Amino acid sequence: MERAIERVLISAEEIERHVAEIGKQISRDFEGKDPIFVGVLKGCFIFMADLMRHVSINCSMDFMAVSSYKGTTSTGAVKINKDLNEDVEGRHLILVEDILDSGVTLNYLKNYLMVRHPASISIATLMDKPARRKAEVYADYSCFEIPDAFVVGYGLDYNERYRNLPYIGVLKPEIYS
Ligand code: IMP
Ligand code: MG
């Protein structure tokens, strides 16, 4: 598996440090607000699991599963495969994503959830690729700003593989072809 990786972009130790930091920051910002963390599956699963262990306030968790159609003729359409179980009216939502790329997915989700009248919607992302942004959406909490490269590991996949790598790596170009 690791032979497919060109280089390590972010080590496991570095991830641990930054995730702990935003966990503390969110705990300060949402003290007494009982937020709901909304994980966007599948990419969020390792990040969210680690992040939650650094959140020290009362909160709950829920998950959504989405898929986006991205081909060459991208319509920006996002399909909801699993919706929330909890009622979010009047609640503070924190969307947890693996990576903010074009922003199409999170922009869609924000609008989709807004009509349920939550008290607020914030975004926590492990990585942000600002160079590729198409939609007007910004992360409130971001661990790493990265260049425009396709990365895998720590929950992120290429064709469903490499999610189990403990670090963030850049794939070798020949893997794509
Ligand atoms: P967006 O709608 O373009 O912001 O896409 C966000 C989703 O695309 C993420 O949740 C990932 O699932 C996927 N994605 C974007 N960039 C990468 C990457 O470099 N590696 C793996 N998945 C990515
Ligand atoms: Mg994802």
Regions inferred by a protein language model and the residue ranges of each:
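PRPP-associated nucleotide enzymes
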Residues: M1-S177
